[in-house]
Amino acid sequence: MHFRNFNYSFSSLIACVANSEIFSESETRAKFESLFRTYDKDITFQYFKSFKRVRINFSNPLSAADARLQLHKTEFLGKEMKLYFAQTLHIGSSHLAPPNPDKQFLISPPASPPVGWKQVEDATPVINYDLLYAISKLGPGEKYELHAATDTTPSVVVHVCESDQENEEEDEMERMKRPKPKIIQTRRPEYTPIHLS
């Protein structure tokens, strides 16, 4: 975005630490801090446990650069530690930038469309009249061959299904022929009272 500018803070390092003991054990944390205190006495640490990162703030950029040169990709407690210069974000304005007006008129149409805008005509639907004619000639139970088979292609045949009314009538006749099921009542279990009064 045009209003954001990333600059590097050369007096701060970000340490990517794979060992999570640094965030929980004070002895491990003291060992870690002693590595960097040799380069600068006025150093501060910020621990970000969920990101597995530590921000190390030096008093001057030279000691930060020296620490990065000496300690980058070194092992700490058996795992590799990587160091990077911290990035600071400078926002040019405290307000959000408005969106680019490329297709803004589609979201909220203005009183008149943009210059050069033309309405797109809808394409006419593709209707296969041969297929409609062939289907109209068919009756129930008949079949119609749309395309004859060749040596390389199969034939296309349409089979017309029987109407739903005939199926419904057959189902109704079967229901009438079946005897009505007799419902047998379930006997109530014997009741014996626990407390007699």
Swiss-Prot record:
Gene3D superfamilies: 3.30.70.330. GO terms for molecular function: calcium-dependent protein serine/threonine phosphatase regulator activity; nucleic acid binding; protein phosphatase inhibitor activity. GO terms for biological process: calcineurin-NFAT signaling cascade; calcium-mediated signaling; locomotion involved in locomotory behavior; negative regulation of calcineurin-NFAT signaling cascade; response to ischemia; response to oxidative stress; short-term memory; skeletal muscle fiber development. Phosphorylation increases its ability to inhibit calcineurin and decreases protein half-life. GO terms for cellular component: cytoplasm; nucleus. The modification Phosphoserine is found at S108, S112, S163. Pfam families: Calcipressin (PF04847). Residues 163-173 have a biased composition (Acidic residues). Keywords: Phosphoprotein. InterPro entries: Calcipressin, Nucleotide-bd_a/b_plait_sf, RBD_domain_sf, RCAN1_RRM. Residues 163-197 are annotated as: Disordered. Belongs to the RCAN family. Interacts with RAF1, PPP3R1 and PPP3CA. Inhibits calcineurin-dependent transcriptional responses by binding to the catalytic domain of calcineurin A. Could play a role during central nervous system development. This is Calcipressin-1. It comes from Bos taurus (Bovine). The lineage of its organism: Eukaryota, Metazoa, Chordata, Craniata, Vertebrata. The gene is RCAN1.
